[in-house]
């Protein structure tokens, strides 16, 4: 009898494991159907959407809308934060928006003081942007990636772990504030000017995945913007906003909030906006301070570096060629690895996380290309892409969290490391980094080709 029970139990275990586990797929991405589908769709859209244009008047407007919930809410960011509910507000959270209109095209660059722009929010925006005469391709969504901000915006098991108990009112709140910020910024538009700037701040960033074995992305990318008598900046940087640990239960923007507040309080700037850049594998270099001392240190040090170049003035120009695009991104079947060679089957991932479409955002502002990706994108890979863009006489900003989420995309050479980013959060294969790099290079090449054709036609 015992032998029969043992055999039956073993059969049940084998069936269970076969239904839930699968070998890690290491098929090269170029051999899979999703790759061909992505390239085809992207090339189609690139051909159909040649909407770059320059008008005779440049208008720019800023808006800042409070996103702080009226009651205590879950905090998003750390799976091991228990409980998830905030105790109080340390500093308020906001949606910051810049609207730019060159007389032919209009765009909105948005940053929310959130962990990510949740996919549920993007679904709402797709429905409601039409009501205010906007469309999703005209919107560049980004987040500060603070790990101590509003949660409760993601249904499903993974959403609960990362962002706390789901409540539909939170995605609705975020979407409504984004829509309001776009309308306000549009109403605030005045004759404007713009400038792109870049500085290196290696002292505030480290490779948190492999330390000195890897590359860091030290570059802070900076849009300087004028709107009438007002002047603002929008900064992009790669260090994770994790100065505040999982022990913190107070709502806060972390160091991005310190950066923005310091710039407005200590310079002539009226607005200072921050967005996460390519943050995968990149952590803040905080020194030995504790919690809010750390966020204060990183935010202030970053602000002082930017203030130095602001003293000399930015090289503004009032002519702006604008192109915008949002292209579909297809990936292989998702897998959550439990070891180097074994993972949960895709159906478990889809049950726990949900199924959402993924897209890449692209803005072209003269010789600046802005790429918004639906993931924690590798700072190591970003450095390679910056250099590639410069070889084409283009500047490049890469921002994570554009309204979708595909986990982490680290450098492929770290895929088999037994660490959090590549083991638990790299869901789409051993060569996903190379795939993302190829897609971004395709977009850069298209812009470069169009620029060369335009220059030739104007000769």
Identify the meaning behind each predicted range.
Residues 302-305, 309:
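Anionic-ligand-binding alpha/beta catalytic cores of soluble enzymes and soluble regulatory domains
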Residues 2-9, 15-142, 149-270, 275-279, ...:
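Conserved beta-alpha junction segments in alpha/beta enzyme cores
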